[in-house]
UniProtKB/Swiss-Prot annotation:
Mg(2+) 2 binds at residues 271, 273. Pathway: Cell wall biogenesis; peptidoglycan biosynthesis. Belongs to the D-alanine--D-alanine ligase family. ATP binds at residues 135-190. This is D-alanine--D-alanine ligase.
Amino acid sequence: MKSLKQQKIAVLLGGTASEREVSLNSGAAVLDALRSQGYDAHPVDPKDMPVADLKQQGFERVFNILHGRGGEDGVIQGVLEQIGLPYTGCGVMTSALTMDKMRTKMLWKGFGLPIADMEIVTKNTALSLEPQAIVARLGLPLMVKPSREGSSVGLTKVDSADKLKSAVDLALKFDDIVLIEEWLSGDELTVPVLGDEVLPAVQIVPEGEFYDYNAKYISDNTRYICPMPMSDERWDELKNLVKRAYEAVGCRGWSRIDVMTDSEGNFRLIEVNTTPGMTSHSLFPKSAATVGYSFEKLVEKILELSV
């Protein structure tokens, strides 16, 4: 068996999803980190070269840093399984499932794990939407989001029943399934998992009302506190919850799980990122750094976990 450093490694980056730019940035950082440690790593953009040809081109392993649809939704993973190349991150089923926020949440709910109360709307049911009834059940404000778009695209905070319809219509432009969720007014945090190690939680403090695309990728005024201050008991509770959430959907390798707290301080699971960002702004490397992983060593560890 060749050692990892003797293998030709493809770093999959770019792609065609709305998060292409983020993936190009993450990919460049990962590529540098691998090359600086003596790996034979090469950038491959599926936009320019079919992933199905990787084996013919002599590649032996894949570091997947594609974000969003086409890269994080099981499609690429299926191609890699088909041609028999080991790759980083989650497998086909988990990647497909976690791309769909609604189905992920239903699964967690089935396992008895805490999620936000929500109403599910489809293109068909949107026609008979009853804003007053939804507000009566879930209260105000509400969060409206497409089920399958990443990077906070298509999100709206709704403050009154009469604005619900237009928020749903906006979200339906990005997906056929839309979630209307109770507003969680507590803290926003994200917890990375590396192999079977839960890394310190990062608290996200956006300057606006919630963590949108601007706060994620552009603004320098979003504050990140890592590790997030909490008691040991509270951290144990969060760590166990994240581990159960990770295992319930079948994650492997690495993932990042977003969590919020409600007005009473109870944790609620939000979503899973199976290919977290790896840019200078990204939260996974920020968290890993607090327990001694340099960016280079983190990238190497993710590669070592590839199957």
